Amino acid sequence: MATYVFIDQNIPLVYTVETGVITKGFGDLLFVDVSPIEEQIKKLETLVDAYEHSLDPRYPPLNSFPNRDGVYAISGYFKSAFFGFWIGLGIMALLAIILGVKF
């Protein structure tokens, strides 16, 4: 069974999902240039791939210099060290206040 998508109700345009053909109503064929849409879809696919790869630290960012593999992993180490330092310092300060250590 064919699946149809109505594009416009005023002008009876129908898109057939299985064949990818846009027809006028259910009769004559209407030819449409879809190459600009395909170019935009390709750009969107590259951005989606870059977004998916940003979740994996083994891949470089989309617009980066060559040999930048592992930049996300390195930034993960620095972020962990940064927050670990400040959280540890805060815990030590709380313990010093609770124990009544005089400076």
UniProtKB/Swiss-Prot annotation:
InterPro entries: MtrB_MeTrfase (IPR008690)
Subcellular location: Cell membrane
Keyword set includes Zinc: no
GO-annotated molecular function: tetrahydromethanopterin S-methyltransferase activity
Domain of life: Archaea
Gene Ontology BP terms: methanogenesis, from carbon dioxide; methylation; one-carbon metabolic process
EC number: 7.2.1.4
Keywords: Cell membrane, Membrane, Methanogenesis, Methyltransferase, One-carbon metabolism, Transferase, Translocase, Transmembrane, Transmembrane helix
UniProt signal peptide: none
Membrane-spanning parts: 81-101
Reactions catalysed: 5-methyl-5,6,7,8-tetrahydromethanopterin + coenzyme M + 2 Na(+)(in) = 5,6,7,8-tetrahydromethanopterin + methyl-coenzyme M + 2 Na(+)(out)
Similarity section: Belongs to the MtrB family.
Complex formation: The complex is composed of 8 subunits; MtrA, MtrB, MtrC, MtrD, MtrE, MtrF, MtrG and MtrH.
The protein's name in its UniProt record: Tetrahydromethanopterin S-methyltransferase subunit B
